[in-house]
């Protein structure tokens, strides 16, 4: 991957992080605490945790995100390359067995969305990639090789799109003429499959979401990451999870309700204030759930 000219500073690293004040309240960072940012991304949340005095272990599978964090020279930040689903082993390799807090900001980060070349956005022309890392199959591999029935299942399950079969059929017909290689190609195919679309939310949004979730196994990673949090958090440690759609939020909610060692801090998810939503439209769908690691008393 070719990196841009090195103009990175601690200030330029920040992206627009959602629910920043709420995350700080949930994790309560103070000097001496060790906190894991399992989804480092643009390091917006990490910067705030560092300013509060915590030592942060930032995990990301995106090498570009890690390079930017290293170049920023943020003190008390240790970066680790990998998926947060593997954070137990990643931290063990760094000599850490327990932590005071864990943050998971699920999905694609703002700076990944804004990087046209990554293929996450249907608004700009780019190779149809969508991989957080550079390993595994890309979104182009999926749309060009999967059976229509399997494509429909992915779009329905992960995109919750009622027209999944119609979209899969349109993809199948289009790829018979030529491979689908770019984001705009796919977006136009999906748009044509929607009857009477004129304006509003682009009909490709759900399909792109579904492909991204599938390509990166995001829901599987979330389940593994939640289990890892139970292992890593010391008693009194806090977990904060930000999700952006109902699939993720349901997984987090059910996991916390079923956990014997994680006690939810709020009955309902925390959402962005009206002021934040006006400033940062991406925060409108964000939901924060937080929990505290408790000690389970063994029955006598």
Swiss-Prot record:
GO terms for biological process: rRNA base methylation. One of its GO terms (cellular component) is cytoplasm. Its main location: cytoplasm. SUPFAM superfamilies: Putative methyltransferase TM0872, insert domain, S-adenosyl-L-methionine-dependent methyltransferases. Transmembrane segments: none annotated. S-adenosyl-L-methionine binds at residues 43-45, 60, 105, 112. Specifically methylates the N4 position of cytidine in position 1402 (C1402) of 16S rRNA. PANTHER family: 12S RRNA N4-METHYLCYTIDINE METHYLTRANSFERASE (PTHR11265:SF0), S-ADENOSYL-METHYLTRANSFERASE MRAW (PTHR11265). This is Ribosomal RNA small subunit methyltransferase H. It comes from Deinococcus deserti (strain DSM 17065 / CIP 109153 / LMG 22923 / VCD115).
């Amino acid at each position: 991957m070719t990196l841009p000219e090195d103009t990175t500073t601690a200030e330029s690293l920040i992206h627009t992080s959602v629910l920043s004040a709420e995350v700080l309240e949930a994790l309560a960072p103070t000097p001496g605490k060790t906190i894991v940012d399992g989804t480092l991304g643009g390091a917006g949340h990490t910067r705030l945790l560092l300013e509060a005095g915590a030592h942060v272990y930032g995990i990301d599978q995106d090498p570009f995100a890690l390079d930017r964090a290293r170049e920023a020279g943020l003190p008390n930040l240790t970066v680790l390359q990998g998926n947060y689903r593997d954070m137990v082993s990643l931290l063990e390799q760094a000599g850490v067995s327990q932590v005071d807090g864990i943050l998971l900001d699920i999905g694609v980060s703002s700076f990944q969305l804004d990087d046209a070349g990554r293929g996450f956005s249907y608004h700009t022309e780019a190779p149809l990639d969508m991989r957080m890392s550079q390993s595994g199959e890309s979104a182009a591999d999926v749309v060009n090789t999967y059976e229509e029935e399997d494509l429909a299942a992915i779009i329905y399950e992960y995109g919750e799109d009622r027209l999944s079969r119609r979209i899969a059929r349109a993809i199948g017909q289009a790829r018979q003429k030529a491979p689908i290689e770019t984001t705009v190609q796919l977006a136009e195919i999906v748009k044509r499959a929607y009857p009477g679309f004129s304006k509003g939310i682009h009909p490709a949004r759900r399909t792109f979401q579904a492909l991204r979730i599938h390509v990166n196994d995001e829901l599987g990673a979330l389940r593994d990451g939640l289990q890892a949090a139970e292992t890593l958090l010391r008693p009194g440690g806090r977990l904060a999870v930000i999700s952006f759609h109902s699939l993720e939020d349901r997984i987090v909610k059910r996991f916390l309700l079923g956990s014997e060692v994680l006690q939810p801090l709020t009955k309902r998810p925390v959402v962005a204030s009206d002021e934040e939503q006006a400033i940062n439209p991406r925060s409108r769908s964000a939901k924060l759930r937080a929990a505290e690691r408790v000690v389970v008393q063994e029955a006598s």
